[in-house]
Regions:
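Short beta-to-alpha linker loops that shape the active-site pocket of alpha/beta-hydrolase fold enzymes
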Residues: 13-17, 87, 208
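Alpha/beta-hydrolase-fold enzymes
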Residues: 54-145
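Catalytic active-site module of serine/aspartate enzymes centered on a nucleophile-bearing elbow/loop
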Residues: 199-201, 206-235
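Short beta-strand/loop motif that positions the catalytic acidic residue
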Residues: 169, 175-177, 181
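Catalytic nucleophile-loop/oxyanion-hole region of alpha/beta-hydrolase
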Residues: 18-52, 219-224
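Short alpha-helix in the alpha/beta-hydrolase fold that links the catalytic acid
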Residues: 171, 185-195
Length: 235
């Protein structure tokens, strides 16, 4: 849909995912992940030097994009940001004992994998997400350091006391979340939208699940992607 609207798309496999090397789920340390985003942006700038660039992130990627908007090295060079279903507040709450356990584990064994099992039906339209079960790159793992950093950054962004530098927060952002998300609670996005209401266009999708772009029983998610396309075209 983006390409049909003459919008070029560049993507990267995050550390610990896809075809990258390393322990599966070890998308850490965060400062290096943000540097990876720098490289993606610079690559896009090199390919299209006179074209505006927008950074798009979903779920944990949404957490990373919000983080980048706050303190990324090139955050002020971007025209805008699109974030969907970000990891700010999890549906499954992390208790104090669990938090301190992960904190200790992250220090002692940062690459220790924590496995999770997510029902595909909780993600989006079943005929779209069922294929994940046979995807060789799906691993359902996150490491202790990645979990801790993502959790702490999400918490700081929720309370709006996360580190800020550059002009990223002055750039427009489209933030979207489904009110039936069973992975990342919609309350997190509502709080981000309130914290950043001057530059944030917040859209809450009724009866939509975690992967907005993959729809639900009534829709295939096309309208969500089209909303993102219209935002990018408006920049």
């Amino acid at each position: 849909i983006f390409n049909r609207n003459k919008i070029a798309v560049f993507a990267l496999d995050l550390r610990g995912h896809g075809k990258t090397d390393g322990v599966r789920g070890h998308t850490a340390p965060r400062n290096m992940v943000l540097e990876d985003v720098d490289k993606l942006i610079l690559y896009a700038m090199e390919k299209y030097p006179d074209i505006k660039i927008c950074l798009y992130g979903h779920s944990m990627g949404g957490n990373i994009v919000l983080d980048y908007r706050n303190r990324g090295n090139l955050n002020g060079e971007l025209a805008g940001y699109v974030v969907t279903s970000p990891w700010i507040t999890l549906q499954k709450k992390v208790g104090k004992l669990q938090y301190w356990g992960i904190k200790l584990l992250a220090k002692a064994m940062p690459k220790h994998q924590i496995k999770s099992k997510i029902d595909p039906a909780a993600l989006g339209r079943i005929d779209k997400v069922k294929k994940y079960e046979n995807d060789q790159y799906m691993h359902g793992a996150i490491t202790a350091q990645c979990a801790l950093e993502s959790f702490e950054i999400a918490r700081d962004m929720y309370y709006d006391n996360h580190e800020k530098k550059g002009a990223g927060r002055d750039k427009p952002m489209l933030l979207m979340h489904g009110d039936k998300d069973e992975i990342c609670h919609v309350a997190g996005s509502r709080k981000i939208a309130k914290n950043q209401e001057d530059t944030c266009d917040y859209v809450e999708w009724k009866n939509m699940l975690h992967e907005l772009h993959n729809g639900n029983e009534e829709s295939d998610g096309t309208q969500v992607v089209e909303q993102a396309v219209e935002f990018v075209k408006s920049l």
